[in-house]
A protein has these predicted regions:
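C-terminal regulatory/interaction regions
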Residues: 3, 255-281
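Short, surface-exposed connector motifs at secondary-structure boundaries
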Residues: 54-58, 82-86, 154-156
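N-terminal non-globular leader segments, chiefly Sec-dependent signal peptides
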Residues: 1-17
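Conserved beta-strand hairpin/beta-sheet module of binuclear metal-dependent hydrolase folds
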Residues: 25-79, 172-194
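Divalent metal-coordination and catalytic microenvironments
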Residues: 38, 52, 62, 93, ...
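Active-site HxH/HxHxD metal-binding segment of metal-dependent hydrolases
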Residues: 39, 67-70, 77-150, 249-250, ...
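Metallo-beta-lactamase
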Residues: 14-20, 28-30, 34-36, 58, 65-67, 85, 148-152, 157-247, ...
Length: 281
């Protein structure tokens, strides 16, 4: 089990990393690329951002930092798209590194912003849970995900799955795509970090211990999904950028049978060391 000193060191390292990103956002640049079907990577080396071309407008998943918005806009345009055409912004959860740029993008495009409802109180009652809320200009949440209904816009279908843990409202996105004339399944888990999930952190944040078991149960359940292409919310969870370089950006190169299960199992193994009590259900 993680000691108090180890926990403090882990959290301090995270904050130092974030502050470095705010100060020098250009160091996070990564060229944009096509993933599969309607899905494009327009994120940076720390936070993934995905652009979906529905044929009836664009959907963007996680705008990332406000400090990297100029990189995001450049990446979208480099692929031949116009940020003005973004109709929906899907947020995976309410942390600064995923939502920081939402206000800029929402005002620029007029897009509707979506969030998992359990995270909504971050933006009304508990800005401390956003982490560095002063780096998140206020934005309007227009819609909450319906976890019982598939979302469709043009040629794109998306299934939303509630996967609480990292935050109460983490949402996982499952998106079919066509590769080589065949339908493959892509998926993005909205938040695999263990930061915030130890019991001392849950106490400090006044959040329920049930988030621990919810997280583990969610990972175990998601392992059953026959995912062909992993869309990582962070590249350190799964090296999509490495696969892009390895396979020259070819769609087939992102197909990785078992990659989804391996990624989730790796997080479960971390849970056994950091939050072993999460398995007591």
């Amino acid at each position: 089990m993680e000691t108090k000193e180890e926990r403090a060191a882990r959290l301090a390292a995270l904050m130092k990393k974030l502050h470095g990103f705010y100060a020098e956002p250009w160091k996070l640049y990564h060229e944009p690329f096509h993933v599969a079907g309607p899905i494009y990577f327009v994120g940076n080396t720390y936070v993934s951002t995905f652009l979906l071309d529905t044929g009836e407008g664009l959907i963007l998943i996680d705008p990332a930092f406000k400090e990297t918005q100029y990189l995001l806009f450049d990446s979208i345009r480099a692929l031949g798209f116009d940020p003005h055409d973004i109709r929906h912004i899907f947020l995976s959860h309410g942390h600064v590194d995923h939502v920081g740029g939402t206000r800029y993008l929402q005002e620029y495009s007029g897009a509707q912003v979506w969030l998992g409802e359990p995270d909504a109180f971050f933006f009304t009652e508990r800005p401390d849970l956003i982490i560095d809320a002063d780096h998140v200009p206020p934005f309007t949440i227009n819609n909450y995900y319906d976890y019982h209904k598939e979302f469709q816009m043009g040629k794109v279908k998306i299934r939303f799955i509630a996967t609480p843990g990292h935050t109460p409202g983490v949402t996982t996105f499952v998106i079919p795509a066509e590769v080589g004339g065949k339908t493959v399944l892509t998926a993005m888990h909205g938040g695999l970090g263990l930061n915030g999930l130890t019991r001392p952190e849950l106490d400090d944040n006044r959040l329920p211990y049930t988030l621990q078991s919810d997280f583990v149960k969610g990972l175990q359940e998601l392992q059953k999904l026959p995912v062909d292409i992993v869309l990582p919310s962070h590249n350190h969870n799964y090296d999509m950028l490495g696969r892009y370089k390895q396979f020259g950006g070819k769609e087939e190169g992102f197909i990785d049978p078992g990659g989804w299960q391996k990624m989730l199992q790796g997080v479960l193994n971390q849970c056994k060391n950091v939050i072993p009590e999460a398995f007591e259900f």
